[in-house]
Every structure is written in C-alpha cells, then in structure tokens.
UniProtKB/Swiss-Prot annotation:
The gene is atpG. It comes from Akkermansia muciniphila (strain ATCC BAA-835 / DSM 22959 / JCM 33894 / BCRC 81048 / CCUG 64013 / CIP 107961 / Muc). GO terms for cellular component: plasma membrane; proton-transporting ATP synthase complex. One of its GO terms (molecular function) is ATP binding. Keywords: ATP synthesis, Cell membrane, CF(1), Hydrogen ion transport, Ion transport, Membrane, Transport. F-type ATPases have 2 components, CF(1) - the catalytic core - and CF(0) - the membrane proton channel. CF(1) has five subunits: alpha(3), beta(3), gamma(1), delta(1), epsilon(1). CF(0) has three main subunits: a, b and c. This is ATP synthase gamma chain. It is a peripheral membrane protein. HAMAP family: ATP_synth_gamma_bact (MF_00815).
Amino acid sequence: MGNLRDIRRRIKSVKNTSQITRAMQMVASAKMRRAQDQAVKGRPYIRALAEVLYHLQDEIDTSNSPLMQTHGGADLVLLVNTDRGLCGGLNANLIKMVREQAPENAHYITIGRKLNAALAKLNERLEATWSLTDPLSLLELKPVFDFIVQKFKAEEYGRVFVAFSGFVNTMVQKPVFRQLLPIEPEPLMNMAKAGGSSLDGADAHKQFLLEPSPAALLDTILPLYVFHGLVQIVLEARASEHSARMVAMKGATENAKNIIGGLTLDYNKARQTQITNELLEITTAMRAME
C-alpha cells in the first residue's frame, strides 16, 4: 500500500504542476500574439527611416553629425534580456553569443535583470539596468535612449552595441549582436533593403522630396532612427520571450501528461499485483482449511 500511496502522491503532484504550466502557456500565448503583431508591424517604420537616412547621405556630408561620428572611447553593450525565466534557452543562447562577439573590456547596460548575475560572474562592468512594463510604454525607453546618446556624444563611449533575441517565428528566436552607434552606411543600406526597397539605379532618389533641407532633416531623423530602433529591438525581444515561454510551457505540459500516463500505468500494475497477491493468500488459506 505504501508504494501505491507514493504513486498516487506523485500523480497528484504532477497534475498540479501541469495545471500551472498549462495556465502559464495560455497567458504566454495571449501575450505572444500581441507581441508578435507589434514586432512585425514596427519593422516597416524603422526600415523607412533607414531608407531616408541612406539617401540623405548622398545629399550632404554626414561625417560631422554627432551620431554618425567615429571617435575614441570605451565600448558599451546594451543587453536586452528578460526579467523572468521559464523561457527555454533564450537567455542562455543570448549570453553565449555575447561572450563570443562582444569586445573585450566592454561596459554593459541591461534591459531586463535575468542576466545581471551572469554578467557579474563574468566580471563584466554593469553601468545601469532597467525593467520595462509589459506591454511596453515608449516613455520608459527615454531614459535608456538619453543615457546612450548623451554618453556617446560626450565621447565616453566610442561604440555602442546591442544584443537581443531577434524574432523569426514562434519556434525560432535568433540571438543578434550589432552596432547601434555610430550609425554607418552599410547597416543603413541593409536595413532599408530588408523591406524590399530598391536603393540602386538613377530613379532611386526621385522617390524623395527633401524639405525643409537635407541638413534639418538629418538632425531630426537621426535621433528618431536611434530611438525607434531601440523600440523595435525591445519589441523583437518581447516577441521572442513570449514565444519561447509559450513553447517551453507547452512542452512542459505535454511532458507532464506523459509522466502522468506512465505513473498511471505503474499504479495499475502495482494495484493488479496487490490484488493478485491477496487472491493467492485467500486461496492458500482456503486450501489450508480443507
């Protein structure tokens, strides 16, 4: 009976766990759909800004623009991770990529606190960290933007990189490491072309009427591009997080069902053995009484 009680206790425990993972799966699924929709809808906007900036480079000299200027200073890495776990290998893959690609002796700032302990173990210098609400409020990113831009303009940092989990689809999230500042021509071109826009040919520039002037537009659009680039990065990371969590919780729920099935089979076998032994005892006792 002790063995049967243990099996029943384990079945009950796994059922309780499966109810929790199932509830978390449903919550993550709802958040995932919203986050994926926001990430996908934000891509055309940032690509359009990249295309305008790319064309502006041919109209004026951008080398003196503060956000496109190359200068000395330390390297800064913005690490966009999660505040909570239970999202599969998302954060593990991200920190692995950072260890492989980040410059040596870089300084770090983070959005999300889950990987702060990992950075501490690696003896990395953490300058600041932020936690953002879900769904995202654009105003929450203003302090991050101000920190990066002010430090870069003051030449405390010569390069700013960003590491995040790029959203591909529900099953696939790809770690991404790229330069945020200074803004360079080739990444601008690649970003614009990602939207299916043609940047080649004599007619390419005829798509744009630049008012009031290319210089005024550049001063306005460059900060917009950096800020909304940050917004898009966070949206991509959120879509990746909720997708990974939904998949992880779905897998945990399915594993729980398999475990319950195996334990139920073990319980039935143990019960059958117990009944058989009891029948044998009764039969033996009856024969002894004859």
